[in-house]
A protein has these predicted regions:
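Conserved AMP-binding/adenylate-forming core of the ANL superfamily
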Residues: 8, 30-74, 78-82, 99-104, ...
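Conserved pre-ATP/AMP-binding loop-to-beta segment of ANL
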Residues: 28, 162-182, 189, 215-225
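Conserved AMP-binding A3 loop
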Residues: 41-43, 178-205
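Structural core segment of the AMP-binding/adenylate-forming
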Residues: 58-59, 86-158, 485-487
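AMP-binding/adenylate-forming catalytic core of the ANL superfamily
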Residues: 98, 115-117, 274, 391, ...
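Conserved AMP-binding/adenylation subdomain of ANL enzymes
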Residues: 201-225, 233-272, 287
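Gly/Ser/Thr-rich phosphate-binding loop
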Residues: 246, 268-276, 285-353, 366, ...
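Conserved beta-loop-beta connector loops within the AMP-binding
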Residues: 364-388, 424-425, 487-491, 531
Length: 548
């Protein structure tokens, strides 16, 4: 019998354009909202994607060219998420919170020739203009109105109105590069992470299956109202704009993140599903407007850093359906989600414990905890090792950096650089970054576990724990504590809080700090993560200035 393929059978490529098919069929009248400025339906979204594609094509953008975007979260960014890769070009998302020299580096390193830039960022672009010799075409994204600056080809809306729209987008290799962005690591230059059409489609489908398949808790469905509170320049806003679009969900984009504005949008647009780093949620709950904002039933995935128990307790008390997720820039990012069966898990402590874990792997993810020899450790919730993973959407390497790529994929698994354990039920808990584990007296102390304990004190607003050099023990933990406004807590109280948990067996006695530093603020990276490298430089007398 012949096994030759049928001559007319179509080898269907997994391309980003396919994500638009279902919403246009089932919910074409659903809305896309941008702050208080823009409101239109999915039919208009499709038309605008075609217009943007036509504009870019008319400006000479072709297959494989890189188009950069510098904008806050907006409908324009969503349109670029689709239009740029759908013509075969590569979408480069500029992290606008990097230093100007780093932004110039990432634009040059990515090979960007075209940029869509918000008027707010023109002073920054002007400052690095001489460092961008290959940036040939500029399109203005303008909320405020005003004249077109020199060297700009057109304003975005005017360009769309004058463009001949692309109606039928071509098929091409599903492994073609679709996006590139840059990690915000605390060492060295930013690294370029890239993803193909196939990877982004499979990531979207797996996220839909994981979030949409939940029985009740944390479930994402077509009646939700989605608003990202993770920047669209950061890991595709965790890929959720692609998911929300594919599902035909009402979407709200807030522009620049201002707490009062975010809370007002949640109330006005009845937002039901978001995601953010712990810092952002903490900031929102601390804002005076939060007390008058109904947050009951708001589903929030926390990622980018571990979900502190104290923050989870506070969110649950407000009726927020809060739960953890886990991944990294290199994993697109989704690896695990901490959803629970609320009907079978009723004990409050167990519910809190599960919600604050990293969760269980989403479909298609092969997740392991390994020792230094790549051997598996026991899934008992105790044995720890490095988290390594395989999935069809993990980056295949760092752009133009084969040495770092080889290290990332040593042994055929992607190395996350995180330490964790998996319990009998399959839930992952990340206990620390390898580089942040405090090695003291032969023991490994989790800085995250210490932070969780200290954060429970009612007078503590924020806490970060770092390891500082010690001649006797190698390293010792130093908690850096931000007090709540109007509150007071003494050093001895923090030390005794940890000591009490040590006496009850919750943490090693080696974790009890000798001193505590009270600070006004905690240094963070451009995407809101605690910058422990910088904190060590500031507070370790061996590495930096020391001080209290």
């Amino acid at each position: 019998m012949s096994s030759a393929p049928t001559p007319d059978a179509h080898a269907y490529p997994l391309l980003i354009k396919q994500l638009l098919l279902m919403p246009l069929a089932v919910s074409p009248e659903q809305e896309i909202v941008y702050g208080d400025r823009v409101r239109f339906d999915y039919r208009t979204l499709q038309a605008r994607i075609g217009q943007l594609a036509g504009l870019l094509t008319s400006l000479g953008v072709g297959h494989g060219d890189t188009v950069a975007v510098m904008d806050w979260d907006s409908n324009r960014y969503l349109e670029a998420y689709f239009a740029v890769p759908m013509i075969g070009a590569v979408l480069m998302m500029v992290n606008v919170r990097l230093a100007p020299e780093q932004i110039a580096y990432t634009l040059n390193h990515s090979g960007a020739r075209v940029i869509l830039a918000n008027r707010e960022f023109l002073p920054l672009l002007d400052a690095i203009d001489e460092q961008l010799p290959d940036l040939r075409t500029r399109i203005l994204l303008d909320d405020a109105g005003g004249p077109l600056p020199p060297r700009f080809a057109t304003e975005y809306e005017a360009g769309l109105r004058g463009a001949t729209p692309v109606v039928r987008f071509p098929d091409f290799d599903e492994n073609a590069r679709a996006t590139v962005f840059y990690t915000t690591g605390t060492t060295g230059l930013p690294k370029g992470v890239y993803f193909s059409h196939r990877q982004l489609v499979l990531h979207s489908l797996a996220a839909m299956a994981a979030l949409g398949g939940a029985p009740r808790q944390g479930r994402l469905h077509r009646d939700d109202v989605y608003m990202p509170i993770t920047p669209m320049f950061h890991v595709h806003a965790w890929g959720l704009p692609y998911v929300a679009t594919a599902m035909g969900i009402r979407q709200v984009y807030p522009g620049r993140y201002l707490p009062a504005k975010l809370l007002a949008l949640i109330a006005r647009e009845k937002v039901t599903f978001s995601h953010c780093v712990p810092t952002i949620l903490h900031m929102l709950l601390e804002h005076p407007d939060a007390a008058q904002t109904d947050l009951e039933g708001w589903k929030v995935i926390i990622g980018g850093a571990a979900l502190p128990r104290a923050l989870a307790q506070r969110a649950l008390a407000r009726g927020i359906d809060i739960f953890g997720g886990y991944g990294m820039s290199e994993t697109c990012p989704l690896l695990t989600i901490a959803q629970i069966d609320v009907d079978s898990v009723t004990d409050a402590d167990e519910v809190l414990s599960l919600r604050t874990k990293a969760g269980i792997p989403v479909p298609l993810v092969d997740l392991r905890i390994v020792d230094p020899d790549m051997g598996d450790v026991a899934h008992d919730g105790i044995a720890t090792g490095e988290v390594v993973a395989r999935a069809p959407w993990l980056t295949q390497g760092y752009l133009h950096d084969p040495e770092a790529s080889a290290t990332l994929w040593a042994g055929g698994y992607l190395h996350t650089g995180d330490i964790g354990n998996i319990d009998e039920a399959g839930y992952l808990r990340v206990t620390d970054r390898i580089k942040d584990v405090i090695k003291t007296g032969g023991e490994w102390i989790s800085s995250l576990a210490l932070e969780d304990i200290i954060a429970l004190h009612p007078a503590v607003s924020e806490v970060a724990v770092i390891g500082i050099a010690d001649t006797k023990w190698g390293e010792r933990p130093l908690p850096l504590v931000v007090r709540k406004p109007g509150s007071h807590v003494a050093e001895a109280e923090i030390i005794e809080l940890v000591a009490a948990r040590s006496r009850s067996g919750d943490i090693s006695r080696y974790a009890i700090p000798e001193r505590v530093s009270f600070v006004d603020a905690i240094e963070r990276t451009s995407v809101g993560k605690i910058n422990k490298k910088k904190l060590r430089g500031l507070h370790d007398p061996v590495l930096g200035t020391g001080g209290r």
